[in-house]
Regions:
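Bacterial N-terminal signal peptides
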Residues: 8-18
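N-terminal secretory signal peptides that target proteins for export/translocation
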Residues: 1-3
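Patatin-like phospholipase
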Residues: 5, 21-64, 72-268
Length: 268
């Protein structure tokens, strides 16, 4: 992770001279690309800080999965320091669950919560019970909604303080879905809906999951937006060896990472 951030710093310093020579109108446009990579995506925050300290302006920011969250929040004005503080103070055990805060529970719900460690839904409709993921992600969705206060309407992401885009995958047909507009928190949630872990986001006739499946390093999206120079932060997971594939989640994660790697090579 540190090596990746250092590489970004070196590249950033190589770019700083041209920016000091050319006027604002003449300089080339810079796009920052933040890959998916689970918890390692926190490294994106440090990379953004390095870019800022190098004095390099960011004209576009594009992300997938965790990169979409960091990128989306940065695009609306959060600083790296604010993002780092936000990450540190969160109760991630709560966020990555479907638990309800005890303060929001009724007395009956509190008693039931104290009795049972796990709660599974039983219904006559199996489709209703199988929502497509272990975690519905409502707590995360609530956090995203709180963090994007003021951007809850359907908006054009090109009109944000920094033009932004993120990637999701439509599992109905395998298409790549690029969010250039819409509700920001919904776009971020759709981009990080890891199959089998988080429930997909249903929008119109689409069923949207983690964008890493189709484009984990969307440099092509940044170029299409107008970026002449790409600063990429790649924190994609390395493939596991056979001795580390010992559970269903391990194997599912490996399948996702294999798909991500195949598509990633096209953009590097």
């Amino acid at each position: 992770m540190k090596k990746q951030i250092f590489s970004t710093l070196v590249f950033a310093m190589c770019l700083i001279l041209p920016f000091s020579v050319y006027s604002q109108e003449q300089r080339k446009k810079v796009g920052v690309v933040l890959s998916g990579g689970g918890a390692k995506g926190v490294a994106h925050i440090k990379a953004l800080k390095v870019i800022e300290e190098a004095g390099i302006p960011i004209d576009y920011i594009v992300g997938t999965s965790m990169g979409s969250i960091v990128g989306g929040l940065y695009a609306i004005g959060y600083t790296p320091e604010q993002l780092d503080s936000m990450v540190r103070k969160q109760d991630w055990t709560f966020l990555l669950s479907d638990r309800i805060k005890r303060s929001a529970m009724s007395l009956t719900e509190r008693e039931r919560s104290a009795k049972y460690i796990v709660s599974l839904p039983f219904t006559k409709n199996p489709k209703a019970a199988m929502s497509g993921g272990i975690i519905k992600g409502q707590n995360l969705a609530n956090l995203f909604s709180d963090l994007t206060m003021g951007y809850h309407d359907s908006i054009n992401f090109n009109k944000l303080p920094i033009p932004f885009a993120c990637v999701s995958a439509n599992v109905v047909n395998g298409d790549q879905i690029i969010f250039h507009d819409g509700v920001l928190s919904t776009a971020m949630r759709a981009s990080m809906a890891i199959p089998g872990v988080f429930t997909p986001v249903r929008k119109d006739s689409m069923v949207l999951v983690d964008g890493g499946i189709v484009n984990n390093y969307p440099a092509d999206v940044a170029k299409a937006m107008g970026a002449d120079i790409i600063i990429g932060v790649d924190v994609q997971n390395a493939l596991k060896s056979a001795d580390k594939l010992n559970s269903a989640p391990d194997i599912l994660g490996q399948i996702v990472d294999l798909t991500c790697q195949t598509n990633h090579e096209k953009n590097v």
